[in-house]
Amino acid sequence: AESASSSESSSSESTSEGKKFEARYRVDKNGGGTLSVGNDTGNSSVTYTVTDPDKSITVTAVPAEGHVFVKWSDGLTSKTRTDTDFKQNLDVTAVFGTASVPNPSEGKGAVGSSYTFKAALSGKYAKTENLRWYANGQEVTQAAGKSSITVVVDSSMVNASYKIHAVVTYNDCKVSSNTLTITIGSGVTS
């Protein structure tokens, strides 16, 4: 039988052995959020020295109030990223955008009257098609994607109060409006 050489395995060791790489994560200069790594939250930048190329680093971009996470500067669009298999330095920036959903503050109504709710979205990442409406915590599915909804008050709604709010979502980030509370009266005035 031929004897296979047993020395070949030693030459295939990792070529990046002994090299150091730097992994740097930053928040875009316009701000709008922070970075968190495990329980370490609220960072504007985090830097790691990577001596083991198989090391894995997980960083999450956390949008501030009224902001959504847009993307990482290298094109990744999920707010949590895990980098491993380092062959070179990494330097990425988390980009955030503003999004807000203003809402009217209060309303009262009676049977037969109707309400119109409008969400005046602001910020280029607040898109109408990503808008969802909720009444008392339940999504109003037929209102999805509409910036204006009209509700006609019927007798089943008398003496009830409804909390209405709108949420716009972008890349898994949710921005909510204020909650509008409506109280429906019977319409009978004494």
Predicted regions located by residue number:
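Ser/Thr/Gly/Pro-rich low-complexity, disordered linker/stalk segments of secreted
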Residues: 1-19, 188-190
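Conserved "repeat-terminator" motif of extracellular CCP/Sushi domains
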Residues: 1-3, 17-27, 81-98, 164-166
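Extracellular modular ligand-binding repeats in secreted and cell-surface proteins
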Residues: 38-67, 85-88, 158
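Short strand-edge motifs at loop-to-beta-strand transitions and within beta-strands
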Residues: 44-48, 57, 79-84, 90-92, ...
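Short, solvent-exposed loop/linker segments at the N-terminal edge
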Residues: 48-53, 107-113
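Surface-exposed interfaces of beta-sheet-rich extracellular modules
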Residues: 55-80, 124-132, 173-174
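Surface-exposed, flexible coil segments in extracellular/virion-facing regions
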Residues: 74-85, 134-153
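Proline-enriched interdomain boundary motifs that mark the N-terminal boundary
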Residues: 97-106, 189-190
